[in-house]
Regions:
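Catalytic alpha/beta core domains of metabolic enzymes, predominantly
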Residues: 159-305
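Active-site beta->alpha loop and helix N-cap motifs at the rims of alpha/beta catalytic domains
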Residues: 47-150
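Extended, charge-enriched "interface" segments that sit outside catalytic cores
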Residues: 376-450, 728-730, 741-744, 770-815, ...
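N- or domain-start disorder-to-order transition segments that initiate the globular core
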Residues: 1-27, 397
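Flexible, acidic glycine-rich loops studded with aromatic residues
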Residues: 267-371
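Conserved, mostly hydrophobic/aromatic
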Residues: 44, 108, 139, 154, ...
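Active-site phosphate/pyrophosphate-binding segments
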Residues: 534-689, 698-699, 736-850
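Glycine-rich phosphate-binding loops that contact phosphosugars or nucleotide phosphates
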Residues: 446-614, 688, 692-695, 704-711, ...
């Protein structure tokens, strides 16, 4: 007789510890039911991982599942698993019916990540019970302290439960109690207990593996040969002895008055199930944990290899009741040897939870990889060429993130991922895309279109302006919608030229400020509100203004008072630099006619790709962040962003995100945007390159230079976007990456402790102007016909010692010579930001880079104060700063105050410079006199000469 089939006569059911789609679909499960009498199936994450990762049989189902819309990795896996469980349950249903619900079950496990969360375990188990919708389902719940109350609750709801990760006799007693109490509650609520089944899954071979290891240690240390023999005799005996004693406990628990009362109502006993019965020690019989654990009302769930082995040479007998006294003696002997079985089983539960979580990580990684393959055109591609040293560091850090569940904890808003301060209060951006009200944006967009505005102007700074600027530059003017402009400057020329570029009578203004207290958008609003009032009348002016702000801000009050057309509210838990995928970016996008439904749909693909269920090696945002952070720790802290022509403005947004998030506490990453790519010889060993382009922008020359950098040992990340419509994916990728990099660096990426310092200085200066009508006097260290030079006493002394004297060139030469390996030079120009000035600053910076071999920044103030200014003041002291100010050819008054735009800009420049010098930065200010174009040309030539 078939030995497997013979187990039926001894009261034991055989379940199969294996499941795969083809295995069920091809009739193999049905064959085992018919030939071997298999009466159930168990599954776990490891089983599913092997099935999905090691074959292509799930490729088509994954593709079909995603045809109806993208799914998160966990959702996608669950859909596959539920289908597999349903199919297996249907095959086993005749067994279930024939045996009146005593057998014929398929087990599906709740997420191992929930093993220490009672409420979440209950919620998931109840949901899976409903999703599968089969009476012969058993939901697997671990026998952790948090799992026990969940078991009782679920049994009390009439859900059949397979209790897993059971090692200890004591815990088994608690498991049985949870089952009995749950049955009593179910009965009391009017339920029929005959519909409920449960098994208590004792993990067997893992006990021997753990105990044998400790016995081997004892044997190695023992000197007495008799003691060595006694200890050796215990090897391979403990797991079976423990199981036999548990079975004796089972017989006691499921007898007597309490059980009789439940049984009379149709309750079934909670059978002991022997799990982990594949033999791990090759010195033991491959059917040891089957042959020695045969008994009435038990289940043995076996892997296919063990099933085949038992069918081939197994022998069935009533072994579970044999040698009970010997089993007691074996356990007693172990205790006398100084080995605590209780301690071992407690540790095995902890290890089991971790092993199951590890298996789930591998499973979700496999599903994520398959999903990415199916969606290949829908998700922007990323490749990392990091070199050996950095690559190993990223791999090690990634493994730490996986083991410590930091991705899930990040999404759960666990501040301990970072510094444990207030990070949990600033993570609303994680879900802002999913919560976007597309219908409302679409309705608003249509109202804008009907009003035939010629222009739309965003008045904002930092996160309120840079994201909209990227969108405006990337998408351009859309047919039927206004042209989107951004104003983020107090420079009078920039304000005037913006005004000249629009038709003020047919322009809508978006005043964007989270706090409502930011100086620049407030004075810009005051200026343009007055201009609109002049153009269309004061009573109608408010109808041309919108506000985007946080609830309760001062801007909300002003907007209400002045009759703004609408107020859009942001989420107070989203910081400005993370707000582009919230109303601060989406309102300007909608105003400009960008297809938000498409933008959000495409962005959500990246959100899901970076989700809590995607392990580090398959998570693009986390991978980028780990690489950025690890590179920073290795001294490669100059994150050099290379953006192709179609997305050329992306770096302006990314540099704020990176600098303001990481540049603090004396450390951080310094973003380098807009530097023209060159040969390896001009770069130091502090670079980390990120290259972004759309896939239709071929540039062989650029690619050749990138390859040369890679071959020279520089880390290079390549990101290829499907099209500009995927820009939202890059916003989210970089947000996740920056948050992760902050954690790797050990800083809080959501505060900006040094930004306020410059604001305070500026307010002090403008307050003085309001009182006296002039800014406090300042004395240059050198004054020439074309420029004045300013710095503090410490910098002046150092520069004079280095050769600075009475001419501009000597000061520039001494100042730029202070830059060395690992430094960067930042040009901070408080002038109009236009193409000509951008080109001139570019000439200056490239000359510095090529001669000094240092990273360079070219920034315009006051714009950069809300962007990279945080890193310049609070980050590493590796910056050499050249501030450029100039006489304004004209000025513009700000309605309602003495200080003009020019005065405010001057105060901002002075406040910024004062804070830089107070922080001990190497800083020099050059104030150009007279005509700005001539002054910039002179300065450019002076810099070129100073470098030679």
């Amino acid at each position: 007789m078939n030995p497997v089939k013979a187990l039926e006569a001894h009261g034991q059911s055989v379940w199969l510890d294996f499941l795969a789609r083809g295995f069920v679909a091809n009739g193999d499960l049905k064959q085992l039911i018919d030939s071997d009498g298999v009466k159930g199936v168990t599954s776990n994450p490891s089983i599913f991982e092997k099935a999905i990762a090691s074959s292509d049989e799930y490729d088509a189902p994954i593709g079909q599942a995603l045809q109806g819309g993208d799914l998160a990795v966990a959702e996608l896996f669950e859909r596959l698993a539920v289908e597999d469980i349903q199919h297996a349950a249907d095959v086993l249903r005749p067994v279930y019916d024939e045996l009146d619900g005593h057998d014929g079950f398929v087990s599906l496990e709740v997420s191992p990540y929930l093993a220490t969360d009672t409420k979440a375990t209950i919620a998931e188990a109840e949901r899976l019970w409903q999703e599968v919708g089969r009476k012969n389902l058993m939901v697997k719940v671990p026998a952790t302290p948090e799992g026990l109350p969940a078991i009782e609750h679920l049994i009390g709801k009439g859900i059949s439960i397979n209790i897993t990760l059971l090692f200890s006799q004591q815990v088994y007693g608690e498991v049985a109690e949870a089952y009995l109490s749950g049955l009593e509650k179910y009965l009391a609520s009017g339920g029929d207990p005959s519909h409920v089944a449960s098994v208590a899954s004792f993990f067997v071979s893992r006990i021997d593996s753990a105990v044998d290891k400790e016995l081997d240690d004892k044997i190695a240390k023992a000197n007495d040969p008799t003691e060595k023999d006694r200890l050796a005799a215990l090897k391979g005996k403990i797991a079976i002895a423990n199981a036999k004693m548990a079975y004796q406990k089972y017989k006691r628990l499921f007898s007597g008055a309490r059980w009789d009362k439940l049984q009379a109502k149709g309750a079934k006993p909670q059978r002991l199930l022997w799990a982990s019965t594949g033999t791990k020690n090759k010195n033991y019989s491959d059917v040891l944990y089957v042959e020695e654990l045969i008994g009435k009302n038990t289940v043995n769930t076996v892997p296919p290899a063990t099933l085949d082995a038992f069918r081939d040479h197994g022998q069935a007998r009533d072994s579970l009741e044999e040698n009970i006294e010997q089993a007691e003696s074996v356990l007693s002997g172990l205790e006398q040897s100084g080995i605590s079985l209780d301690a071992i089983t407690t540790q095995l539960v902890e290890d089991g939870v971790k092993l199951f979580a590890d298996a789930a990580d591998k499973l979700y990684g496999a599903v994520a990889h398959k999903r990415a393959t199916v969606l290949s055109g829908g998700i922007d591609r990323q490749t990392l060429s990091l070199g050996s040293s950095l690559g190993k560091a990223v791999e090690a850090t990634g493994e730490d993130w996986r083991v410590s569940a930091k991705i899930r904890r990040l999404w759960q808003k666990d501040k301990s991922v970072w510094t444990g301060s207030d990070e949990d209060k600033w993570l609303g951006w994680l879900t802002s895309v999913a919560h976007a009200d597309v219908t409302d944006y679409r309705d608003y967009q249509q109202r804008v279109k009907k009003q035939n505005f010629s222009d739309a102007v965003v008045l904002g700074m930092g996160g309120s302006s840079l994201g909209p600027e990227v969108l405006a530059e990337t998408f351009g003017k859309r047919p039927g919608f206004p042209k989107l402009h951004i104003l983020d400057s107090t420079d009078p020329a920039q304000v005037r030229n913006l005004e000249a570029a629009i038709d003020i009578a047919s322009t809508v203004f978006i005043v964007s400020s989270k706090s409502g207290g930011t100086t620049e958008p407030n004075v810009m609003k005051d200026y343009f509100f007055a201009r609109v009032s002049e153009a269309i009348g004061a009573e109608q002016a408010g109808h041309r203004f919108l506000a985007v702000t946080d609830p309760g801000s001062s801007l909300e009050k002003v907007a209400t008072k002045q009759g703004f057309a609408r107020i859009f509210f942001g989420d107070p838990s989203i910081g400005g630099r993370y707000s582009v995928l919230s109303p601060f970016g989406l309102v300007p996008a909608a105003t400009a006619g960008i297809d938000l439904a498409q933008l959000i749909e495409l962005t959500l693909k990246m959100v899901r790709s970076c989700g809590p269920d995607v392990p580090p090696q398959e998570n693009p945002g986390v991978q980028l962040g780990l690489a950025m952070g690890a590179a920073g720790l290795e001294g490669r802290d100059k994150v050099t962003i290379l953006s192709s022509n179609k997305i050329k403005d992306f770096g302006a947004w990314a540099e704020q995100l990176i600098a303001e998030s990481t540049g603090k506490d004396g450390k951080g990453l310094i973003p380098i945007d807009g530097e023209t790519l060159s040969d390896p010889a001009v770069y130091g060993h502090d670079r980390f390159f990120i290259d972004l382009r759309t896939e239709d922008e071929a540039d062989p020359g650029h690619d050749q230079k990138l390859k040369a950098l890679e071959q020279a040992g520089h880390p290079v990340v390549r990101i290829v976007m499907k099209s500009i419509d995927h820009i939202g994916q890059e916003f989210f990728r970089f947000e996740i990456a920056t948050a992760v990099a902050g954690a790797v660096l050990g800083i809080n990426p959501f505060n900006q402790p040094d930004v306020e310092a410059a604001k305070i200085k500026t307010r002090e200066l403008t307050a003085a102007f309001e009182k006296t009508g002039s800014l406090p006097p300042e004395m240059p260290v050198v004054s020439t016909a074309s420029a004045d030079i300013y710095t503090d006493d410490n910098n002046a002394a150092a520069l004079r010692q280095a050769g600075a004297d009475g001419d501009l060139g000597s000061w520039l030469k001494a100042h730029l010579a202070r830059s060395g390996a690992g430094d960067y030079v930042a040009l901070l120009a408080y002038i109009e930001r236009n193409h000509a000035h951008i080109d001139t600053l570019q000439e200056m910076r490239l000359a510095v880079r090529d001669q000094r071999h240092v990273a360079t920044c070219a920034e315009f103030g006051p714009r950069f104060l809300h962007s990279t200014g945080q890193a310049y003041k609070g980050g590493p002291n590796s910056g050499v700063f050249l501030q450029i100010t100039a006489d304004d050819a004209f000025d513009l008054a700000v309605p309602g105050q003495k200080a003009s735009f020019g005065v405010i800009k001057a105060a901002q420049a002075r406040g910024d410079f004062d804070v830089l010098t107070e922080r001990g930065r190497r800083a020099l200010r050059v104030h150009l006199k007279g005509d700005l174009t001539s002054g910039l040309k002179m300065l450019d030539e002076a810099i070129q000469n100073a470098l030679n």
